[in-house]
Amino acid sequence: MKLRKLLSLSIAAILLCFTGCVNKNTLSKHEPITILAPYLECDRLVDLVHKKYPEINLKVLSYSGANTTTYLQNMLAADDLPDICTQTIYDPNIDDVSDRMIDLAGYDFTDNYVESRLQDISDDGAIYMLPSAYSCIGITYNKTLLEKHGWKLPKSFHDLEKLAKKAKKAGVQLCLTQIEYPGYGFQYMCNIADTAFLGTFQGKQWQKDYLTGKANVSDTKKMMDCMDYIQKWKDLGMFTANKKNPQSDDETIKEFMKGNTLFLLGSKNGIGETDGTKDKFGLMPYLSEDGSQNVYILNVTRFHGLSKKLEKDPQKLKDALKVMKVNSSVEGTSALYEEATLKANLLPFKDWNADNTYYGDIADEINAGNTAPLIYVGWENTLVNTGYRMLEYIQDKATIKDVVDQLDKDQDRVVNNKPEVITTTTEVISQKSCAKLIGRCFMEATKSDAALISLGKWIKGNGKEQNMAGVNGKLYAQDITESDICSILPTGWYDTIQTVQLSGREIKQLCKDGYDAAGTGNTYPYVLVKDKKLEADQTYKVVICGAGKELTLNDSGIVGMNAAKDFFSKFKTLSEADVK
């Protein structure tokens, strides 16, 4: 019996060892699952995934550049996608991604989402991208002021008209409107129209028709009815700029915080929590005339999906689906965001509790589907012009007809106008080559002797911003516009080029040490661009993108974007062979 027992134990031990070896080999055979989620807390997601699925190796790719939306859109267009894809904007009515992304509709983790949020991203029943955290835009109101006068929150525009009379009689201002940016004007117009025709199925079809040149505003009666409704808002007093400095959002909020204004049209939610006031505030929807189509406006900050290329590798697809399962939960999505961000946003899940957020009072309304998506994609070529015209209208410098005329006038630009092409890349220009080109560009612009351009990459422990001072990403084979250049440009849209005086020895040491952006000791490499051999004891004027605090910088005063446009426009076409 003892012999049998020992033999059984020995066999069990051998099997256990064998099983252990198989598991280790299996683990080692799991290819990394790549994810690119710019400016999110990916370290925490990696830790959470590893805790739940130790066999999965989640590899974070990095992008910390100045134009996230354009870069992610270019990746999508080129089908150069990580396994887990991210986009900042997505409209299934406009964006067809069925040939590049997996339909997730049949997977059980989609059941975690509120039905109304799935309807927002449904592509004829298919689901290619799932929403992450989102913000909600409505009309801020002063709860304390309403309670003080015994007034009820209006549930329709008709109610609002009655309340306006009471407010006027009591000496209370009805509304203040923020007008610092032209985008506000465009959104006010769309948000109000969403409570009428624009927010209906037919209205959504009209949007497609406008964007393709098949319909305009002035020839569409129901859209003209929307414009008439906007006029009613103005006549009632809902469009009122602050008198001290109309273009300052801060001044408008200060005026609102004095406590004698009922409503605020603007971009900021959560007013009152840190603004030094005892008044309490809430958020109400944009109101339809009879209250049957009131809407909050939703702006999803990130969408996530899976690359269709995963279908060629069953093991990777299996692992990627597990990551998506984690990401499609309150715990997983919460890991990606800071606490303050979570408090100011909503999550799209059935089991998410909104009580500790600014939206606690209205979460049920939002989940019930009383919402409309933020209108932006496709409208970029009229957004600023129409927005400005709306702001003029708010200030009595234009009429509602002027707004209509602007939309009709801009339609050709919306349908046909393309941004200026600066050069055309005939192949992918790698990140390192982009850094060399930027270095050469900035050297020429500042008449410098050399350039140190740091490279972005993901380093665990360096936070969600990683290296914003360097070159992030690459250029794809396409026509290159200002937006594309901005996506790789360390100085972004408006920043100026910085230089520093360094000896050849110091330059060599910096190349060895790298750029410590996060102060963790985990550094980003520099690409050194130079025209001549650098002598150790000689001092040089050096362009630097990614400078430690110990360096004394000199501001050239030259805007990096201007220099880059001049530099890249010299190339009719651009390839790796042009990189020196």
Question: Which residues make up each language-model segment?
Answer:
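Hinge/lid segment of periplasmic solute-binding proteins
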Residues: 88-137, 152, 282-284
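Glycine-centered hinge/linker elements that transmit conformational signals in sensory
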Residues: 211-244
